[in-house]
Amino acid sequence: MKFYHAIISFLAVFLAACNSNPLQPHSGGRLFEALVVGDTNNIVGKALDTDMIALPQSEPCFDVSSVSHKAFNNTLQLSRNIVVVNLNHTRYHGVKITYEKDVYAHPQIVVSINAPSVTSLSQALNGHQGQLLRQLLERSELNFTISQLRNKRNTRQEAAIKKAFGIILQVPVDMTSSRQGRNFLWLSNNSATAMQNLVIYKLKGKPLQQAGKNMTDTFTSLRDSVMKSNIKGETNAMYMQTVALPVNVNMIHERNKKLIIFRGLWEVKGDAMGGPFVSHVIEHKGNTLVVEAFVFAPGKKKRNYLRQLEAALYTLKQQ
């Protein structure tokens, strides 16, 4: 597992560092949409439209469209995320996944999957290579979202974060509402239909490092304590808390530092509000810093709203 995380961390740097060719046309497509070329029996499509974890309703990791090699014309070549499947039992002796950047347009990633047979392709994508494919496309799309954020930032809120916590974080331009507490800052676009929120808070010491196998329970308890004090409903008896479902945890290395990622669902005690959250946890100057995104969008799909904010979390830099 560490091997795959290392690959994805490397790809994040590589994809962000490559310069686009200004002579190429601009790519298109909705966020987290992928075009699959030459898919047989929808094998790649099934690997990509696996449910994204920790959402309140079923939503796929990617919205997938599929075309044949013959139908892959000049217009479709402008898609931002392309997966090309090549099956040939004499030419390929195993399943291999490779990628190129900005082949037909920019920004763009074109992933090639070469396999000797439908059976070998299916077996590979049901295992680690399916996970690798999703992570590769997810990180490429997050990098695209980060590039969009760079030109539409709220520098006033970024300055407030830097002053309060000593970190650099890119903040979406529409995050105009804020509330500050003790070692706590809440930013929001305050939308009535799709409210996107960023929360930054500091925990004294390194409680997760000491928690061992109980790290998820420890984080949930600490998170609930912070949210109960800082994010309340109409009365003091109403406050944000973590939904009592398994919270997903993942550890990776980002910029040579350990990053712990928690995903789960939140709700307001005593109210009908809730949605997904994702928290990035790092050690910072002897303490623990949590940078979290959460979404409230009743009646709407949540994936892209959360992914947009998750891209912002990856811009965090320590001073």
Where in the sequence are the language-model features?
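A surface/extracellular/periplasmic glyco- and lipid-processing/surface-interacting theme
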Residues: 136-167, 173-174
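Secretory pathway targeting signatures of secreted, lumenal, and periplasmic proteins
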Residues: 22, 35, 172-231, 267-268
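Sec-dependent signal peptide recognition
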Residues: 2-9
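C-terminal motif of bacterial Sec signal peptides marking the signal peptidase cleavage site
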Residues: 14-17
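Soluble non-cytosolic domains of exported or imported proteins
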Residues: 39-43, 119, 123, 217, ...
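Surface-exposed amphipathic alpha-helical segments
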Residues: 123-146, 175, 288-319
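Signature of long, low-cysteine stretches enriched in small and polar/charged residues
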Residues: 67-120, 227-288, 300-302
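Start-of-domain marker
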Residues: 20-108, 124
